[in-house]
Amino acid sequence: MSDIALTVSILALVAVVGLFIGNVKFRGIGLGIGGVLFGGIIVGHFVSQAGMTLSSDMLHVIQEFGLILFVYTIGIQVGPGFFASLRVSGLRLNLFAVLIVIIGGLVTAILHKLFDIPLPVVLGIFSGAVTNTPALGAGQQILRDLGTPMEMVDQMGMSYAMAYPFGICGILFTMWMLRVIFRVNVETEAQQHESSRTNGGALIKTINIRVENPNLHDLAIKDVPILNGDKIICSRLKREETLKVPSPDTIIQLGDLLHLVGQPADLHNAQLVIGQEVDTSLSTKGTDLRVERVVVTNENVLGKRIRDLHFKERYDVVISRLNRAGVELVASGDISLQFGDILNLVGRPSAIDAVANVLGNAQQKLQQVQMLPVFIGIGLGVLLGSIPVFVPGFPAALKLGLAGGPLIMALILGRIGSIGKLYWFMPPSANLALRELGIVLFLSVVGLKSGGDFVNTLVNGEGLSWIGYGALITAVPLITVGILARMLAKMNYLTMCGMLAGSMTDPPALAFANNLHPTSGAAALSYATVYPLVMFLRIITPQLLAVLFWSIG
């Protein structure tokens, strides 16, 4: 059997063993996708004992490509809601994540001085404990630049391998422990997160208001500022027993009932101007109007603003709200349509059918994946991650690397949505398949590389003490900040788990957090919110520690 065939076969075996381990649960808690790492260590040990030779170049390519696939699909998934989340809660999340990095660096410095751990070893333990491979590479590079002998630099890789598996376990254990301590109901947390997801952090509401302000009598809707803006949509008007879709030129009269859509604060302002809320139903049942949800799939309308399509004027149809990647938005005129947007339309059946034809509403297109944008995005992400950033006083340039670059590029492209006929929407099933494939490939290789000398170092060397040091570097920051975030900031549990995983730049921990609830995207969103800044800090922290320890001896 050729080296390539043998390598692929071993990787498949690792995936099977690891996924089996991950599916084993104790009291409902399992390793999930993180089990692949331990499957790799087990198989790697026996591969080493049998003297098998695997293709190191192929393993390296598979590891990096798997990581790229994982972070890219995460970015595409959360991109549409990422920047809205950043405005609402991003500062708080990033402050907690930075605190985790700082505490981890302090614990590392204390361990280095107290136990006189060699610099390469402690940097490797730090990188493994925070499960950050780019930190390992950055640390090795600066050690070489500082003139450290190669045999000492290689020790960094072994100590990294010792700390890495238990770094992952530490994150999973912390999530589980916090869940037990605070008696978290995951379903309740998911519902609370879902209820707070909108562009401004408030749930989109509807309200029926009676026109009671005499100053509004006989005015056109376009002449009433609060109804002609982008914060509130008037989707229905009822006069006596007649229900109709209002247009900008529709004249309102005292006693008219208006069905308004918007955020609670804006609807409250509308009440102050227009009149009181009423319990009268403005349902389309039994009328010649209907409400339908239509999906944007026509490439000709991508990137166009809602107001430029003139649906009200041409078809007498109102877009009452817009759902983008699970986030409910007020359908303001300035919003540009993206592939996969779901629009709530109100109008007559024939008019809605005409608008649906304009928008596309081709359900089969939602199941298709455009592969060209995928590889364009990955290529641009790799280029972004390869750009060196020179910082005064640093002997080596800093880079986002193959993990940070594709993630940031995917966030940007996911937010843009489309450029011309290229759209970065990816069906959820396809996104999940690529994401799971990527993380399985990445963890399989990491486990295989660690498995060869893992048992020997653990039993006969200083492996146990290295693991202990790594456990402290992992656990102390996570537990401290986790308790603070829950007690002081009342942070949502799923959001907190994503923040903890992101603060350790740990894809397996994110996979575990995602599996806590089958449909909630809270963990992925908070992970992506903190990941870019934390990745940069994780890359420069070992370099800062190396320069600091080297200078003070």
From Swiss-Prot:
The keyword Membrane applies. Residues 191-276, 279-361 form the RCK C-terminal domain. The chain crosses the membrane at residues 4-24, 28-48, 65-85, 95-115, 158-178, 371-391, 393-413, 439-459, 464-484, 493-513, 533-553. One of its GO terms (molecular function) is monoatomic cation transmembrane transporter activity. One of its GO terms (biological process) is potassium ion transport. It is found in: Cell membrane. The keyword Nucleotide-binding does not apply. It is a multi-pass membrane protein. It comes from the Bacteria. One of its GO terms (cellular component) is plasma membrane. Keywords: Cell membrane, Membrane, Repeat, Transmembrane, Transmembrane helix, Transport. NCBIfam families: PRK03818.1, YidE_YbjL_dupl. Belongs to the AAE transporter (TC 2.A.81) family. YidE subfamily. HAMAP family: YidE (MF_01016). This is Putative transport protein YidE.
